[in-house]
């Protein structure tokens, strides 16, 4: 594709680049905020799991999560494997947080 077909001039291209990067920075902030919010729920989740005598790892819940991610990947036309890898990291973060809380509770430090 010819460069001239995309933009009127370099000013327009630079402006779009700048604005797009600013928007990505905002989105990155929102993503990190939501991951933090999700991780903070680990305390409530582990307390409920302790009360219900459940393990930290819940195979059925993770299946639901990954089924939703797979469907969303298709709906949003995003590589499913990449989204699943991202969710693996996010769920690991939550499980690690739950394990840490459980360890502190057992040691009487929470």
Please state what every model-predicted region is.
Residues 1-110:
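Domain-level signature for soluble enzymes in the chorismate/prephenate branch of the shikimate pathway
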């Amino acid at each position: 594709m010819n460069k001239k077909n995309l933009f009127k001039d370099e000013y327009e291209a630079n402006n779009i680049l700048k604005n797009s990067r600013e928007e990505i920075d905002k989105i990155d902030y929102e993503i990190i905020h939501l991951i933090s919010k999700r991780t903070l729920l680990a305390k409530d989740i582990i307390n409920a799991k302790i009360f219900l005598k459940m393990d930290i790892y819940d195979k059925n819940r993770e299946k639901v999560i990954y089924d939703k991610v797979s469907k969303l990947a298709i709906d949003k036309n995003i590589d499913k494997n990449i989204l699943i890898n991202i969710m693996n990291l996010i769920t690991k973060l939550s499980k690690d947080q739950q394990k840490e809380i459980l360890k502190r509770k057992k040691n009487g430090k929470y």
